[in-house]
Each structure stands twice: as C-alpha cells, then as structure tokens.
C-alpha cells in the first residue's frame, strides 16, 4: 500500500495515499482497533454532512466564511449525502466519548475532497482547512450531539413511525373484522369471562396507538440542536445569531422542524432528549413483546394447544420433527424487543454520565438508539407482512373452548348469587360435567333459565 504524509499538531502521520482522510482520522484508526471497522453509524455521518453544510451557509451569511469556501464545503457534503464517499469514514463507535475523531474525520475528508474538486492533489496544502473552515464556529462538543439529534429524529420520523403505524392499522382492521367472534377470555393464564376476538385485538391496536403518541410527544425536545454552543455551551467563537441561523439551515436541508436548543449547556452536558425518545421506543418494544406472546400462545398447537387463531405458515419449523411449523415472526419480534430493552439500559446508564459540561458516552448512545429505531421498524413491517395480516380465527376451536369454559357461570351471579354460582362451577369441574347439567341437578336453576341467562354473546358487553 502506498502512503502519503499528513500532519496535525502532534506531528506527521502516514495515511493511505488514495484516502481523503488525514492525520487525526488515521490516528484514531490506529489507536482504537475495537470491534468491526467503520461501525460509526452511517446515519451519523449523513447527519454530520447536513450540519457541516448548514454551518458553511450560516458562516457565509454572517460574514465569517467566503462564498467560494461555502460552496466547496456544500458540494462535498452533497456527495456524502449521495453516498459517493462512503469508504472515507472508517472509524468505530469505541473512540473518544465526545465523538471528536469522527467530527475530524468529516472535517478532513471535506477539506481534502474540496481541494481535489478544485484540481488539487491529495497531500498538497488545501484551500479549505479542516479546522478553520469546515469546523468554523463549531466544536466536537456541539457537533456530535447535533448529529445525534438529526440522525435520531430522521430515523424515528421517516422509518420507525410509519412502520409502527402500518402494524397498528392492521390490528385495527383485524379488530373490526373479528368483532362478532365470541371467545373465552383469560386472566392469570386461566379461563375468564368471554370477550370477542375483535375486542382482544383492539387492545393491541390501542397499545401501539398510545406508544406512537408517546413517541411523537418526545419529538419537540429531540428537535432542539446543540450546534452553536461550541465547547461548553457558551457559544465561544461563533458570530452573533449563528446558533439560530445554522438550525434554520439544517431544517431547510433536512425538511424537518429543527430549532436551536433553548439551553446549550443542557444540550452538551446531557442527552435527556435521546433517553426520553428511546424510552418511548422501549414502551413500544414492550407492547410488541406482549402482543407477540399473546399471538403465539393463541396460535399454539395445532392440536394440543390453545389454537384459537391461525397464523401464516411461512417455513418448516424443525430439522427433526416433520410437518412442524413455528411462530417464527413472534419469536423474532420478542428478540427485537429484548434487544431494545438492553439498548435502553445502555442508553440510560450512558445518559447519566454527563460530568459537568459534557457527556462523553455519545457514540454508544447514538449507535444503540439508531439500532433500536431501525429494528423496531423492520420487525413491525416483517410481522405485519408475514404474520398479522394473515391471522384468521379458528372458529371450531374457539367454539369448543367457549362451550367448555366454567367461567360462563359468572352470568348467573346476579340471579342466584356468587356462592351458588361457584358451587355449580366446582361441581361441574369435579364431575367432568357441564355447567347446565350441574345447575339443574343442584336445583339452582331450570333448563330454561340457564339457556336464557348463560349466553356468551350477551356477556361481551358493548365496549370495543
């Protein structure tokens, strides 16, 4: 491999000759050989491109940067956003907790690429300086948290929310389709009074609806950007009005409602907005866990389980048991939920580590957040496509379970009293007989009264 010599304030560094990065990026590559290379999320790189372009425009408008340099920086940022420079960002998550080296990776690549676009060669002194121009009016301490918010907001709004809404809509449709299917309810995993399958599915739709509401309610905080706070939140070395102006440009370029942070000190020292939004993602993950568990239990069998619903048969389920089919989409969903719960633990702890004016767990928070947001989106689409949309009632099994339930006796409470109703249920269970048989044998009701009072379809109420 051929190398060229790049310099920073610590001296000379050998850099691969054909790469646009420079000394500080190469030092980080050599110093942090931890985990897979280039593990810094691409969403963070893209977010940096948006903010570097916005900073160039804001600085130029405020007289701190020439329009020539602005246009060169913007041109390279557009190339990054078009995925033309993907191989130029080799750094890992496991680096400085402020993300300084990734910030410099962007600065160096933009400066060197701009020089080449001007007809220069790598290794020559560039017309664009990585610190003085690309990083003008910025610090890693305000750029990385800004990139975190841009990446997180975009992912949640453009990817996660639409996917959850899709699955929520399917459950709402199923709830309406199953509104007349009366089945036995279960509490404590034991038989309970009847409800409709539609009512059961309405709970799933409502869970996701509330989860979406919680998620959307976190977005105003996430939309606040730290950029303009520079090193500790004071805005040192920025032109007047820069913080507001740069946020306006980011909003313009992303077409998302970003604004400057109300308090830059909070925006640098803490990442409560990330914790808050991920908390809503965790809420949704726990809802999905519950839903997936219910569905795989309701579909259990096919002959020796509950078996009240039929789910799509997507692939063989066993390498040894012929004909076995498993609830694989439910299993995938529960594993995703477990991962999100683990990510939330990491994010919550990392968020507590804001010592004085700076939190230094930024990259791991960003990576875990983005993984959760993407996984939840992917699993909602997968579950909707390969499971939820194909769920159908198993009518014979539902009727069999309903007729066999002792908890239908609850309908007699208001006619013969709780204790007499309990006596009927216990006697029927002990003798292996029906509720009707024992109610008549015990002389507590007539056959006509039993048929009039114990009607499952009248026990489901009017709530939907």
UniProtKB/Swiss-Prot annotation:
Pfam families: FumaraseC_C, Lyase_1. Its main location: cytoplasm. Pathway: Carbohydrate metabolism; tricarboxylic acid cycle; (S)-malate from fumarate: step 1/1. One of its GO terms (biological process) is malate metabolic process. The record marks 331 as: Important for catalytic activity. InterPro entries: Fum_hydII (IPR005677), Fumarase/histidase_N (IPR024083), Fumarase_C_C (IPR018951), Fumarate_lyase_CS (IPR020557), Fumarate_lyase_fam (IPR000362), Fumarate_lyase_N (IPR022761), L-Aspartase-like (IPR008948). It is found in: Cytoplasm. Disulfide bonds: none annotated. One of its GO terms (molecular function) is fumarate hydratase activity. CDD domains: Fumarase_classII. It catalyses: (S)-malate = fumarate + H2O. Substrate binds at residues 98-100, 129-132, 139-141, 187, 319, 324-326. GO terms for cellular component: cytoplasm. The active site is at residues 188, 318. Transmembrane segments: none annotated. It is an enzyme of class 4 (lyase). Keywords: Cytoplasm, Lyase, Tricarboxylic acid cycle. Its EC number is 4.2.1.2. Involved in the TCA cycle. Catalyzes the stereospecific interconversion of fumarate to L-malate. Belongs to the class-II fumarase/aspartase family. Fumarase subfamily. There are 2 substrate-binding sites: the catalytic A site, and the non-catalytic B site that may play a role in the transfer of substrate or product between the active site and the solvent. Alternatively, the B site may bind allosteric effectors. PANTHER family: ASPARTATEAMMONIA/ARGININOSUCCINATE/ADENYLOSUCCINATE LYASE (PTHR11444), FUMARATE HYDRATASE, MITOCHONDRIAL (PTHR11444:SF1). Homotetramer. This is Fumarate hydratase class II. The lineage of its organism: Bacteria, Pseudomonadati, Pseudomonadota, Gammaproteobacteria, Pasteurellales. The gene is fumC.
